[in-house]
């Protein structure tokens, strides 16, 4: 029999300890991984609700199971809020992840063997944009475009490549590109070769929702995003589109029944909360601060002699190129981690190292901004990071790490994630 008094701590202390340890790690570490963020207690509450128990195959008003009247309310709330947030006529809130949202778009619009043209993973793209190890590079003929030595998209080169390979779809979006993408230019190129323009805005969706980064919605045939990252919601996916009822039918069918069975209604409830939060005025203030903080950190790294790819940032992330300092991304990641600063190693343009080693680190500001860091705080943080990087392979390295960790713990105590 079930009782509301049941809890994990009494039943499974090993698991409970891991949960508590992760809570402490998040509170005592500074999170700079660009794809990570802190969900609100409201979002987490929704994910733990009784909708965990409910199967709801189909869509609102057209389910294959009974007892879905409240699931319909939840899903319709999420759909309506997503459409309002991004200025879309169509939203599918059922994809379990960004990758599954992307897979549904490919399935809806392409046939196996069709050519797609997406940003290379090594140049800042995503696995699902045509990487050889991904379904997107196995099922479809994937061509890749890259960035210049200055870290920018060369639209003339992209146009030339598109005319040469004649893709059925051009994929816009990125996981490690710090500048503004010209969505209108990409649509222009797609139209020239008769291709769909599909944009994966997962990394910048929160910035776009807040109006601090250009929206692809007026230009793309289809847009996808995750609902975590800059949106700060639950881990999940979302598909958006405008002005084409036939396309909407194809997308719905590609999600269910082609790609997924029952939706995760408890996660859709959390998405509804997330979208409501993102429609609030304070969300715009938060996203503007995310960009200000990223720019402030970039300036410190540049002043300290570190090369920032593309020489700056216009969004929530930037890449630090460590080649000239003789450091690897893997070693830098490990050293910073010991001082409770979490980043991720990342390839840089023309990277001489293997993908698991790399010559750079990716730094993002959504999470630190969420816990209250301002420009002064992140500038100080960037200085601490440079201190650690400067000390690598030197006698004072251990002392610098120890000193920095003390400072990190102090600022984390001053600015907790969940006060």
Swiss-Prot record:
Pathway: One-carbon metabolism; tetrahydrofolate interconversion; Amino-acid biosynthesis; glycine biosynthesis; glycine from L-serine: step 1/1. Keywords: Amino-acid biosynthesis, Cytoplasm, One-carbon metabolism, Pyridoxal phosphate, Transferase. The keyword Cytoplasm applies. Its cofactor is pyridoxal 5'-phosphate. The record marks 228 as: Plays an important role in substrate specificity. GO terms for biological process: glycine biosynthetic process from serine; tetrahydrofolate interconversion. It is found in: Cytoplasm. The modification N6-(pyridoxal phosphate)lysine is found at residue 229. (6S)-5,6,7,8-tetrahydrofolate binds at residues 121, 125-127. Coiled coil: none annotated. GO terms for cellular component: cytosol. GO terms for molecular function: glycine hydroxymethyltransferase activity; pyridoxal phosphate binding. It catalyses: (6R)-5,10-methylene-5,6,7,8-tetrahydrofolate + glycine + H2O = (6S)-5,6,7,8-tetrahydrofolate + L-serine. Its EC number is 2.1.2.1. The keyword Secreted does not apply. It comes from the Bacteria. Homodimer. HAMAP family: SHMT. Belongs to the SHMT family. Catalyzes the reversible interconversion of serine and glycine with tetrahydrofolate (THF) serving as the one-carbon carrier. This reaction serves as the major source of one-carbon groups required for the biosynthesis of purines, thymidylate, methionine, and other important biomolecules. Also exhibits THF-independent aldolase activity toward beta-hydroxyamino acids, producing glycine and aldehydes, via a retro-aldol mechanism. This is Serine hydroxymethyltransferase. The lineage of its organism: Bacteria, Pseudomonadati, Pseudomonadota, Gammaproteobacteria, Pasteurellales.
């Amino acid at each position: 029999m079930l009782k509301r008094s049941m809890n994990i701590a009494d039943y499974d202390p090993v698991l409970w300890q891991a949960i508590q340890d992760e809570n402490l790690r998040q509170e005592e570490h500074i999170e700079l991984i660009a794809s990570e963020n802190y969900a609100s207690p409201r979002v987490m509450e929704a994910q733990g609700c009784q909708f965990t128990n409910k199967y709801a195959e189909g869509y609102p008003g057209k389910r294959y199971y009974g007892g879905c009247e409240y699931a319909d309310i939840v899903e319709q709330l999420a759909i309506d809020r997503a459409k309002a947030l991004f200025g879309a006529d169509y939203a599918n809130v059922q994809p379990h992840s960004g990758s599954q949202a992307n897979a549904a778009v490919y399935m809806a619009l392409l046939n196996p063997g069709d050519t797609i043209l997406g940003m290379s993973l090594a140049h800042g793209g995503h696995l699902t944009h045509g990487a050889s190890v991904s379904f997107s590079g196995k099922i479809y003929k994937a061509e890749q475009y890259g960035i210049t030595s200055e870290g920018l998209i060369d639209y003339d080169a992209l146009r030339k490549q598109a005319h040469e390979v004649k893709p059925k779809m051009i994929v816009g979006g990125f996981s490690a590109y710090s500048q503004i993408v010209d969505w209108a230019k990409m649509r222009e190129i797609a139209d020239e070769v008769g291709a769909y323009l599909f944009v994966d805005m997962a990394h910048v969706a929160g910035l776009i929702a807040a109006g601090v980064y250009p929206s692809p919605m007026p230009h793309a045939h289809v847009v996808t995003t995750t609902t975590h990252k800059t949106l700060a919601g639950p881990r999940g996916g979302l598909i958006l589109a405008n002005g084409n009822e036939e396309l909407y039918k194809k997308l719905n069918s590609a999600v269910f029944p082609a790609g997924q069975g029952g939706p995760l209604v408890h996660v859709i409830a959390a998405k509804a909360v997330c979208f409501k939060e993102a429609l609030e005025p304070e969300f715009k203030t938060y996203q503007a601060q995310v960009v200000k903080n990223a720019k402030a950190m970039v300036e410190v790294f540049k002043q300290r002699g570190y090369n920032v790819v593309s020489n700056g940032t216009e969004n929530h992330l930037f890449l630090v190129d460590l080649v000239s300092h003789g450091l690897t991304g893997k070693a830098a990641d490990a050293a910073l981690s010991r001082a409770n600063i979490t980043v991720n190693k990342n390839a840089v343009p023309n990277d001489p190292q293997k993908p698991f080693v790399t010559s750079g680190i990716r730094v993002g500001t959504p999470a630190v901004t969420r816990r209250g860091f301002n420009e002064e705080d992140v500038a100080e943080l960037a200085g601490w990071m440079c201190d650690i990087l400067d000390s690598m392979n030197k006698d004072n390295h251990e002392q610098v790490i120890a000193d920095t960790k003390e400072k990190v713990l102090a600022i984390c105590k001053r600015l907790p994630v969940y006060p």
